[in-house]
């Protein structure tokens, strides 16, 4: 877990923003307001000293959406989800296949509502490691393990294998990742 720069580390600090994240947020505000020099300067305070603030990039892009590493070095601002009975993320239900596969996966509450365009999918080279995380075209049946192929690419970031219902996903929703700060 990333260290808090101006807070004492304790269990009660979980979910609190640290100094580096605050600077990144200020940089985004300046950028939004069109004050590009202030944005550049504020973001540089963190980007040029990322290790001091506990930020960096995961070696594996997919780690941003895994339970054990999603609150890691790239997490600047995100919505934390937990397993039931706590609040959970409904993104898996919105992205899961309902009409694009032959048959059913044996998973309830899949709506196939958040569908990326074929044009977006085609923009990713097959060698781009982000493609496998961002999109999913094959799904395993919950009970039989049979692989069912979707006729269209669907969002893959919030898909968790083995869940019996699509609306119980606990993958965090990233609002700002450290990669965004670098790009800004």
Model-derived features: positions:
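Flexible helix-coil transition and linker loops at the boundaries of alpha-helical arrays
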Residues: 3-14
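An aromatic- and glycine-enriched ligand-binding surface/loop that stacks and positions planar moieties
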Residues: 2, 16-143
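Flexible, polar/acidic helix-loop-strand segments at domain edges
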Residues: 119-178
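Hydrophobic alpha-helical segments, principally membrane-spanning helices and signal/leader peptides
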Residues: 10, 19, 113, 162-165
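Active-site lining segments that contact anionic ligands and/or coordinate catalytic metals
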Residues: 72-74, 178, 183
